[in-house]
């Protein structure tokens, strides 16, 4: 008890406030602080908008002839009448990718498949069989909408999907 009293007295001595005086009462007696005034300007917000990332990917511009110099081609306006659909990526490219796992397992992945993915697998096997001389090994994932093909066939499959109208 004596130690607690000693600390209260010492605290009052350090802060210059007697031990019984409430700090809340002292802070309320002072007036509200005068904050500096500010001016709200909306004219300069256009400079801030240039720094913010866009909220959505813009639509690709229209060109006179396709394919463009970089090789990009838009999908056909009426989508192909097939039981499956391969949706473009967010940058408007065909979602066919190369994948390598375990150091040397080379795979080609077709993503964003909607509809009957098994029909796409059969069409891909029919397309790649003459190129390979045998039926390619494929893996279908219905939940994620992906089709994996053993080997690198990304360029051939991109051209084939463009020809189909995706």
UniProtKB/Swiss-Prot annotation:
Entries under Pfam families matching the protein: Img2 (PF05046)
Record-level Gene Ontology MF annotations: structural constituent of ribosome
Protein's recorded name: Large ribosomal subunit protein mL49
UniProt keyword annotations, A-Z: Mitochondrion, Ribonucleoprotein, Ribosomal protein
Signal peptide range in chain numbering: none
Native source species: Bos taurus (Bovine)
One of the GO BP terms on file: translation
Chief site of localization: mitochondrion
